[in-house]
Curated annotation (Swiss-Prot):
Keyword Signal among UniProt keywords: yes
Organismal lineage: Viruses, Riboviria, Orthornavirae, Negarnaviricota, Polyploviricotina
Molecular function GO labels: zinc ion binding
Superkingdom per UniProt: Viruses
Cytoplasmic-side positions: 517-637, 1136-1148
Alphabetically ordered keywords of this record: Disulfide bond, Fusion of virus membrane with host endosomal membrane, Fusion of virus membrane with host membrane, Glycoprotein, Host endoplasmic reticulum, Host Golgi apparatus, Host membrane, Host mitochondrion, Host-virus interaction, Inhibition of host innate immune response by virus, Inhibition of host RLR pathway by virus, Inhibition of host TRAFs by virus, Membrane, Metal-binding, Phosphoprotein, Repeat, Signal, Transmembrane, Transmembrane helix, Viral attachment to host cell, Viral immunoevasion, Viral penetration into host cytoplasm, Virion, Virus entry into host cell, Zinc, Zinc-finger
Segments forming CCHC-type zinc fingers: 555-575, 580-601
Region (Fusion loop): 767-787
Pfam families: Hanta_Gc_C (PF20682), Hanta_Gc_N (PF01561), Hanta_Gn-B (PF20679), Hanta_Gn-H (PF01567), ITAM_Cys-rich (PF10538)
UniProt-recorded name of the protein: Envelopment polyprotein
Region (Binding to the ribonucleoprotein): 526-543, 598-615, 602-613, 621-635, 1131-1143, 1131-1148
Any one annotated GO CC term: host cell Golgi membrane
Length: 1148
């Protein structure tokens, strides 16, 4: 077989690529949204997908097939007889005959179709119990093509058993994807988890529940009873539209509807359920459905042939069905059932919109499927905070976030969130990767800012590596690792301290010996350099003296400059006879020959060496060199002294390096007690405080006249709370803009079944009676007849967010002061003060980005934050404005579709409508320019009918605070505080070290007074590592203190000023293989009590506590350290034996 040419190979490759592209286009996604917690009795889950159009000739061979692992119900897979009802132009019309109502005819025939949504009785009702899934499809057809819509309904338990599978219809493949949302049991609407509870509107006031607009999918079920009119569904529609006298509509059945993505079945009609009545009324108004066409046909045209009638079934002697014949883009369902027959007669009418007007009596049909919308009350699921933790993995970190009730929002500026998620019960977990650990990892999850300290990850890796290396003694290795793996200078100080303790007796003489050798070599070089320099200076002096007395020292023959007189005399004798003055070898008596010889002669320095030897010989054994050479670095006294001094200095450095950096917000490690301020003048504080930060100020106010009189002063400012009086404007809706052309060839403009006439928001313009030949298709040659109807309407409405308008704003902080025994609290507003006889605390002003009349838009839960709109239309809204389509409790508010229609004509073509107004919804415009709007985050929101309160977690707002304490205090009365505080340590959890933190539980007893505002600290013997403000009441109080810091020997106690609990508790060691993030909002605390910083005595106390902690801890560690110390001393003794005493050396 010959080789293929390059052209053939290229064509073959192109063919394969085209085949793959075609296969990809035939794959469609059907998404099934499931809550992530599945319980019994939660009904059915439903989904649908619109497939591409297919030729009408293929419909009769269509078969819905499945490769899914769930059990499909076979009731919809069987063949069912349909009356195919079509229209066409009469064949006997002469050429150029003007179109009229008699130009068209209909035909009826019987066909068998499989897989359509003909659901028998009790199939849906028993699907959940029998674990059966229902798959079917519906058809929307014109004369040439049909567009299928596939529906899938199944028990909600399939969300557990199935993740993905394939369905097929003809040559189209349908990828069914079961996606678990972050909702526990609700449905995802507007980005929030909504549980529709229809009974809430009947039993609770309106401000206690929310109302959402949800999609409804309904399927016709035939149920025939032998007597009565209870199942004659058409009679319910006729009663609803107040139509009387219709007696021939005997079809019996009902609609079974599913609300949203999952629900219990809803029966329509049902007298005891107002949801059923709402759906029934919407069916009566929009008999073909409220979802008019697929999105890709948003701008399309149709040509209406006119009203037609036909026979169903085809064997009927007279017409039993009527409708409107059209050509162009398919709209509504083309399948239905005749209402006049007792036994169901199914009709498939491609290119005909069947009659659905319930205000007439005859020739009506009901659609097999109906899609619409309904507003329902319900409750929004409560959200919980996320827990985020990370582990080191390669150059980055692997992180995981989980929440008990689902994660509705997660993002990170430093990590890649890939949404790989899993569920365990009601928990949702998401894994992601952070590429960099050179900076702290920040994650926003469920409205909270989480920060993972990456230095603690590195510490954990250090502990793991150290323990792995010394795995033979893991207990000792881990205990040493948690001491050594400390970041910064503190860690290096710990390492040096342990090295000095264990190996100092070997390292000190070794390092001293090396340093001495280096110093001796340096001293020798310096002395040698000084000797050579002096010799060169001597030679220069000799040369200058000779030149002054005798003249030039340049040889007249070889022109060489000599340095001594003997050298010049030798040149004069030898150079003139052609001999070298240095080596005495013969040469030419010329300048060039002699100079060339001097370059290779090895004895040119002979006269300088003779002069050097005549001088005193250098003896490098005096002064510094001799002292260094005789230094006894192996002396036990020297080594022991240096060892002790180094241990003391390193302990001081270790304790001093443990202090943290001073920060504006957050805890700063201080010693016990609080600061003292002599009240010589008024005490004034003036500062700016971030909105998310609380502030604690504590001092002892001292009487300048009597230093023994001190008054405890405590000031507590809580976080800023934003109070907004709001007006609930409703729910903002998104919609698809539709532009339709409906052309009618003959007659005047009649109100045919145009799709926009049942839409909630539409405008229409009719161009009646064509006046020129240039605006008619070939088969409509008439002039002065016909109609072009242009319609613009909004379809596929979807609720996207809640909207609130700010009526008024207040910024408040709760201020509490304790001055001696006097305690006062007040919630202070902007430009307001808390005033007592001695203290004045004012909130002077607030820098804010919110203003009254601003509009707040929430596209999800309140905790997710929102957007601020300065301009929001409320009265006259145009399509495309913010707030253009609103769903309110009083109904839908439609925008003005501003613009003008234009009819585009061309000779012998159908007219097409054009619209020159805006075609993009306000929501889509907002999403395209979302970054241009101000955003805000929300923490701890509280909402009611007319008020919204929250805390700003980003510190984007700031308050100006002014505090004045008068110097005219009654020290005699206030300094004598009868309150007695006793402290006891109850429990502790967490770990010591700055990265992890601990939680200390204290029991604080207050006696002798009813209430007392103060701060309780978590301290060890030397320093304090955390504090909390507590308003103590008489009796026992349980106080939780969160702190960070300490060391392995820290016994954390509960302290008040200088008084501490009698016992302390030791926290766990920091096992930092996984580091959990902390809430940034929880750490936004500014604490200032003026306590002194840790000094020399504090350092020694801290070091001593650490040493005692090591000794009282893992005894194996102490044993290993002592053994290493003994071994180093023995090694020192062997390498540096004791020198014999002087007397023994000179003993006679």
């Amino acid at each position: 077989m010959g080789e293929l040419s390059p052209v053939c190979l290229y064509l073959l490759l192109q063919g394969l690529l085209l085949c793959n592209t075609g296969a990809a286009r035939n794959l469609n996604e059907l998404k099934m949204e499931c809550p992530h917690t599945i319980r019994l009795g939660q009904g059915l889950v439903v989904g649908s997908v619109e497939l591409p159009s297919l030729p009408i000739q293929q419909v009769e061979t269509l078969k819905l097939e499945s490769s899914c692992n769930f059990d499909l119900h076979t009731s919809t897979a069987g063949q069912q007889s349909f009356t195919k009802w079509t229209w066409e132009i009469k064949g006997d019309l002469a050429e150029n005959t003007q179109a009229s109502s008699t130009s068209f005819q209909t035909k009826s025939s019987e066909v068998n179709l499989r897989g359509l949504c003909l659901i028998p009785t009790l199939v849906v009702e028993t699907a959940a119990r029998m674990r059966k899934t229902i798959a079917c499809y519906d058809l929307s057809c014109n004369q040439t093509v049909c567009q299928p819509t596939v529906y899938l309904m199944g028990p909600i338990q399939t969300c557990i058993t199935t993740k993905s599978c394939l369905l097929s219809l003809g040559d189209q493949r349908i990828q069914v994807n079961y996606e678990k949302t972050y909702c526990v049991s609700g449905q995802l609407v507007e980005g929030i988890c909504f549980n529709p509870i229809h009974t809430m509107a009947l039993s609770q006031p309106s401000h206690t529940y929310d109302i959402m607009t949800m999609m409804v999918r309904c399927f016709l079920v035939i149920k025939k009873v032998t007597s009565g009119d209870s199942m004659k569904i058409e009679k319910n529609f006729e009663t609803l539209v107040q139509k009387n006298g219709c007696t021939a509509n005997n079809f019996q059945g009902y609609y079974i509807c599913l609300i949203g993505s999952s629900s219990e079945p809803l029966y329509v009609p049902a007298l005891d359920d107002y949801r059923s009545a709402e759906v029934l009324s919407r069916m009566a108004f929009a008999p073909h459905g409220e979802d008019h066409d697929i999105e890709k046909n948003a701008v399309s045209a149709m040509r209406i042939a006119g009203k037609v009638t036909g026979k169903a079934p085809s064997t009927e002697s007279s017409d039993t069905v009527q409708g409107i014949a059209f050509s162009g883009s398919p709209l509504y369902t083309s399948t239905g059932v005749l209402t006049s027959k007792d036994d169901p007669v199914y009709i498939w009418a491609p290119g005909i919109i069947m009659e659905g007007n319930h205000s007439i009596c005859e020739k009506k049909t009901l659609p097999l499927t109906w899609t619409g919308f309904i507003s329902l009350p319900g409750e929004i699921e409560k959200t919980t905070q996320c827990t985020v933790f990370c582990t080191l993995a390669g150059p980055g970190a692997d992180c995981e976030a989980y929440s008990e009730t689902g994660i509705f929002n997660i993002s990170s500026p430093t990590c890649s969130i890939n949404r790989v998620q899993r569920f365990r019960g009601s928990e949702q977990q998401i894994k992601f990767v952070c590429q960099r650990v050179d900076m702290d990892i920040t994650v926003y999850c469920n409205g909270m800012k989480k920060v993972i300290l990456t230095k603690t990850l590195v510490i954990g890796q250090c502990i793991y590596t150290f323990t792995s290396i010394f795995s033979l003694i893991p207990g000792v290795a881990h205990s040493l690792a948690v001491e050594l793996c400390v970041p910064g200078l503190h860690g290096w100080a710990t390492m040096l301290l342990l090295l000095t303790l264990c190996f100092g007796w070997v390292l000190i003489p070794t390092i001293t010996m090396i340093l001495l050798k280096i110093l001796i070599a340096f001293a020798y070089l310096c002395s040698k350099y000084n000797t050579d320099s002096k010799f060169r200076i001597l030679i220069e002096k000799v040369k200058r003296e000779y030149q002054k007395t005798m003249g030039s020292m340049v040889c007249e023959v070889c022109q060489y400059e000599c340095e001594t007189a003997k050298e010049l005399e030798s040149h004069r004798k030898s150079c003139s006879i052609g001999s070298c003055p240095y080596c005495l070898n013969p040469s030419e008596a010329t300048t060039s020959a002699l100079q060339a010889h001097f370059k290779v002669c090895k004895l040119t320095s002979r006269f300088q060496e003779n002069l050097r030897k005549s001088l005193t010989v250098y003896e490098p054994m005096q002064g510094c060199y001799r002292t260094l050479s005789l230094f006894r670095y192996r002396s036990r006294f020297f080594v022991g002294l240096v060892w002790c001094v180094l241990l003391v200095l390193e302990l001081i450095v270790w304790a001093a390096s443990a202090e943290t950096q001073n920060l504006n917000a957050g805890w700063t490690d201080t010693a016990h007690g609080s600061g003292i301020i002599p009240m010589k003048t008024d005490l004034e504080l003036d500062f700016s405080l971030p909105s998310s930060a609380s502030y604690t100020y504590r001092r002892q106010l001292q009487n300048p006249a009597n230093e023994q009189e001190k008054i405890p002063f405590h000031l507590q400012l809580s976080k800023q709370v934003i109070h907004a009086e709001i007006q609930h404007l409703g729910h903002w809706m998104d919609a698809t803009f539709n532009l339709k052309t409906a052309f009618h060839c003959y007659g005047s403009c009649e109100k045919y079944a145009y799709p926009w006439q049942t839409a909630g928001c539409f405008i229409e313009k009719d161009y009646e009676y064509e006046t020129g030949w240039g605006c008619n298709p070939p088969d409509c040659p008439g002039v002065g007849t016909g109609c072009t109807a242009c319609g613009v309407y909004l379809d596929k409405l979807k609720s996207v967010g809640k909207v609130f308008k700010i009526v008024s704003l207040r910024y408040t902080r709760k201020v509490c002061i304790q001055l001696g025994t006097e305690q006062t609290c007040k919630t202070v507003d902007s430009n307001d003060c808390l005033i007592t006889t001695s203290v004045k605390v004012c909130l002077i002003g607030t820098i804010s980005k919110f203003q009254p009349s601003d509009t707040l838009l929430f596209l999800g839960p309140l905790q997710q934050g929102g957007l601020i709109f300065k301009q929001w239309c409320t009265t006259t809204c145009q399509f495309g404005d913010p707030g253009d389509i609103m769903s309110t409790p009083t109904g839908m508010k439609c925008p003005e579709l501003n613009g003008s229609f234009r009819k585009k004509c061309a000779f012998a073509t159908t007219p097409v409508c054009q619209f020159d107004g805006n075609t993009i919804s306000g929501y889509k415009r907002m999403i395209a320019t979302k970054d241009s709007f101000q955003s805000f985050n929300v923490t701890e929101p509280h909402i009611s009918t007319s008020a919204l309160e929250w805390i700003d977690p980003d510190s984007s707002l700031r308050d100006h605070i002014n505090v004045i304490v008068s110097r005219d205090l009654s020290f005699q009365d206030l300094s004598e505080t009868p309150c007695q505080i006793d402290l006891a340590t109850a429990s502790i959890d967490g770990a010591w070290g700055s990265g992890v933190g601990f939680n200390l539980v204290c029991t604080v007893s207050l006696t002798e007074c009813s209430a007392f505002l103060t701060s309780i600290k978590a301290c060890d013997a030397a320093m304090c590592y955390g504090s909390t403000t507590a308003n103590l009441v008489r009796g026992q109080n349980t106080i939780h203190i969160v702190g960070k810091g300490g060391h392995s020997g820290s016994k954390f106690m509960c302290c008040h000023d200088t008084k501490c609990s009698s016992t302390g508790l030791v926290a766990a060691a920091p096992h930092l293989d996984r580091v959990t993030g902390y809430n940034q909002a929880d750490s936004d605390k500014i604490f200032d009590d003026g306590a002194p910083e840790c000094g020399m005595s504090c350092w020694f106390k801290k070091s001593g506590e650490w040493i005692l902690g090591v000794l009282n801890g893992n005894w194996m560690v102490v044993a290993v350290l002592v053994v290493l110390l003994i071994l180093s001393i023995l090694l020192f003794t062997l390498c540096c034996p004791r020198r014999p005493s002087y007397r023994k050396e000179h003993k006679p």
